[in-house]
From Swiss-Prot:
Name of the protein in its database record: 1-deoxy-D-xylulose 5-phosphate reductoisomerase
Cofactor: Mg(2+); Mn(2+)
InterPro entries: DXP_reductoisomerase, DXP_reductoisomerase_C, DXP_reductoisomerase_N, DXPR_C, DXPR_C_sf, NAD(P)-bd_dom_sf
Protein family per UniProt: Belongs to the DXR family.
Stored Gene3D superfamilies: 1.10.1740.10, NAD(P)-binding Rossmann-like Domain (3.40.50.720)
SUPFAM superfamilies membership: 1-deoxy-D-xylulose-5-phosphate reductoisomerase, C-terminal domain (SSF69055), Glyceraldehyde-3-phosphate dehydrogenase-like, C-terminal domain (SSF55347), NAD(P)-binding Rossmann-fold domains (SSF51735)
Length: 398
């Protein structure tokens, strides 16, 4: 019997990699529902191949999608719109597995809906957990949802932890003999740039990651090290560990995806070629393993692996994220919202590369922190933070 999969963000890089794995295992998985924000022509081709029962697009894309469906004689797929549609498919009774791969805050409500419906949730949308934190984790416990990390680093940590670690007490302290988490970072494309060189970075340069094939937003986040900051926050929530037990290690080759240190002096690492199909396949099948077409690591090819500390003077975003996690409450929501606005402005060439962390820092300083008591107050603060960030960008000439 096949398991039914819903892919939120099917036309993105994670969505496409997920389809690649599902296509290799039609005896195990079927696609029930998909969503896309853009690339409607690509979405139609996906629908022709995988024949989902339901598709969700933004309201303004409905006419385009239905027109293309009519041209292709596709009449057996239901079309839904907007956030309501996303929540519907993420929590649908016929869905077993939800791939949460919508980028940014837009993925929060459908991801939370999947968790509250008790689904197996493959979490690729780190921003959803950065914003909702313990609300998301408590919902997973309350509804017996299985929240499995797809980010290569968190998936590596998950594989390197004791098998029952997620069931351990959530104290903020390392449990079951764990002493520290080592979160690896490639360092991005500008690892060896000077501060002066960083002021001249273009969006095109920032979107070219040296090791991974990713979307624009996450590529820019990787270049500023904000991606690693968001991943630090995600790790703290997923594994119930305080931020000072998480050390970021720059590892330019992206072969070791993260490590876990233990009290007996052991360090366990998960290694592999940098291909998102591996963590996706792991999360899909855990505790079993799926065959993929990712080649096994050739250790003779990588005779030297390098490690260094991150330069937080050149890349202040990492410390901003650590400070936001330490502050708790709504600070991570403010951080994430301001960063999304700043990255968007950078991609539109309204601000420079080094202005991205400045926008985030200004927004964090401008807004008062408070407890994250509900999803409603998180969404309210997200909206306010976006407005403050936009105003600041306008004030500096963006």
């Amino acid at each position: 019997m096949t398991q039914s999969v819903c892919i939120l963000g099917v036309t993105g890089s994670i969505g496409r990699s997920t389809l690649k794995i599902l296509g290799q295992h039609p005896d195990k998985y079927s696609v029930f529902a998909v969503s896309a924000h853009s690339r409607i022509s690509e979405l139609v081709e996906i629908c022709k191949q995988f024949r989902p029962k339901v598709v969700v697009v933004p309201e303004q894309k409905i006419v385009e999608l239905k027109t293309l469906f009519a041209q292709q004689n596709i009449s057996d797929i239901d079309v839904l719109a907007g956030q309501e549609g996303l929540v519907d498919i993420a929590s649908h009774t016929d869905v077993d597995i939800v791939m949460a791969a919508i980028v940014g805050a837009a993925g929060l409500l459908p991801t939370l809906a999947a968790v509250k419906a008790g689904k197996r949730v493959l979490l690729a949308n780190k921003e959803a957990l950065v914003m909702s934190g313990e609300i998301m984790m408590q919902a997973a416990r309350d509804h017996q949802a299985l929240l499995l990390p797809v980010d290569s680093e968190h998936n590596a940590i998950f594989q390197s932890l004791p098998h029952n670690y997620l069931q351990a007490d959530r104290t903020g302290q390392p449990q079951l003999g764990v002493s520290k988490i080592l979160l690896t970072a490639s360092g991005g494309p500008f690892l060896n740039h000077s501060l002066e060189q960083l002021t001249h970075v273009t969006p095109q340069q920032a979107c070219k990651h040296p090791n991974w094939s990713m979307g624009q937003k996450i590529s820019v986040d990787s270049a500023t090290l904000m991606n690693k900051g968001l991943e630090l926050i995600e790790a703290c929530h997923l594994f119930s560990i305080s931020e000072h037990f998480v050390t970021v290690v720059v590892h330019p080759q992206s072969i070791i995806h993260s490590m876990v240190q233990y009290v007996d002096g052991s360090t366990l690492a998960q290694m592999g070629n940098p291909d998102m199909c591996t963590p996706i396949a792991h999360a899909l099948a855990w505790p079993e393993r799926l065959q993929t077409n990712v080649p096994a690591l050739d250790l003779f090819e990588y005779s030297q692996l390098n490690f260094q500390a991150p330069d937080t003077q050149k890349f202040p975003a990492l410390n901003l994220a650590r400070q936001a996690m330490r502050a708790g409450g709504l600070a991570p929501t403010i951080l994430n919202a301001a960063n999304e606005i700043a990255v968007e402005a950078f991609l539109m060439e309204r601000i420079g590369f080094t202005s991205i962390p400045q926008v985030v820092e200004h927004t964090l300083e401008k807004l008062e922190n408070a407890a994250a008591e509900s999803i409603e107050c998180i969404l309210d603060k997200d909206k306010v933070a976006r407005s403050v960030a936009q105003q600041y960008i306008s004030s500096i000439g963006g």
